[in-house]
Amino acid sequence: MRTRTIRSALALLLVSTANAALAVSLNPKGTGQALIYPYYTVNNSQDTLISVVNTSAVGKVAEVRFLEGYNGRDTLAFTLFLSKFDVWTAAVTQASDDGGAILKTSDASCTFPRILTTGASFLSTGYDGSGTLPADSGPQTITRTREGFIEIIAGGDIVADSTTDVAITHVQNGNAGGGVPPGCADLSATSFFSDIVAPTGGLFGNATIVNVGLGTFFGYNAEALQGFTDTALFSESHADGPTLADANSSDAAPGGAIANIFNQDGRPLSLSYAIGVDAVSAALMADSIYNEYVVDPSLGASTDWVVTFPTKHFYVDGAYGDGPLQPFAESFTDGVSNVLVEANIYDREEGVVTLGPCTLCPPVDITPAFAYEVNVATFENQIVPVTAGPLGSALTSLLIPPNGTDGAAIVDLAIGDGGHSLSGGADASGSAVTLKGLPVVGFMAYNVINTQAQPGMLANYSGTYRHRSTMSCNGPAGECASVITGGGQ
């Protein structure tokens, strides 16, 4: 594993202004410059409905990027233009029985390339070697595009009354064809570069995973990163649009950024990083995640946990350099990049079952691991074991035996593989700070079936709950005594 000595040294040179600088952080209020949607799927006859809202009185240009779940390779990307107070919606659905995913929208907001009424098909070029990156070791078929996660990153604010602003602003004329921007056809990959400035915040997003036939409905909020950049992220030298690796701050080294996390009492801890993606990872770090489960057979209940590591590919994919890099310990090889963890499953009366790595883990001897960038952990039903939970995922690398019919679980992300941690951060005094755990987002999804409903009536009751989390660090005692991430997944 490569060391980060040079990165740490660069970060130490930049900490004198860290407290006052723009810094990337997870916004608990839900709006920001960059949005992360932890999961989309079209498996199991499901569709994923997505929306993004511009809450500000200024237009935005954003990169929308869909990444498959094995290794975080791109499957579809395009530029979205949001006028002031605009809302954009779309649906991800399955193209055919043996096909991949396809994006469909009837929304009038401008995109480049333009999304036709027939939809935009997800592509395998990001991982099969026919695109700009070499093929990876994951599945090469188009069905790999059916599950993954989504990024929407604002790359610039559109200058008011500029050519681009006029082109993308919806014209409300009171007619049936009203509300349509007049200049979508005039946009190109570069036409707007001179009409944008550094982006401000104000985006929020939602997603819903729907199975019409079963009547299931799993809705969640996108995670929002604020302070992602203080420069425009679209330019002649960066025409492909921003990714999570493009976080930056003018007070950090070129290519670097500052992250804000928070002490338990709410005081911010600013850490400078020489590489932008490390600051994003810092904002998302958790040493443990917490949530509930329910698998009561009398309720027909089932539970999945979505556990997504949205920056993982930058540390484990050989296309981005030699790896693996901490906080991850295993490169993406033979279709997996395992992350060893420890899980403690509690029933409602404090009884606990521990799943290793540990010396003695009675009564179940399982070493749990998350194999992919997007992971779906399924809680098995004690009466009828299952291999796929309510989300019907093909990315279920961990089946968790529950402790009773319902309760809570804690997944320790710091303990495995000899210890997961992110080094390279420096506080305002120049002291090195290492964050324990992994960068993670996700939620719990459950479904309950009412077997007493009238025949022919849909009787599924679904819900989602965002993961909660804690984070710890090694560094100055006053700063690292008890630390949590900004939003607390």
Language model features: what each stretch is:
Residues V52-V58, E68:
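Asparagine-centered strand-capping/turn motif at beta-strand->loop junctions
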Residues L80, A91, D98-Q489:
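Long, compositionally biased low-complexity segments
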Residues V58-V61, N71, V159:
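Short loop/beta submotifs within extracellular cysteine-rich repeat domains
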Residues E63-L80:
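Short beta-strand and strand-turn-strand segments in soluble, beta-rich domains
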Residues S83-T93:
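Short Pro-Gly-centered flexible turn/kink motifs
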Residues V24-V53:
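A structural motif detector for short, solvent-exposed N-terminal "entry" segments of globular domains
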Residues M1-L22:
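Gram-negative bacterial Sec-dependent N-terminal signal peptides
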Residues D74, W88-T89, D97:
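N-terminal interaction/assembly modules
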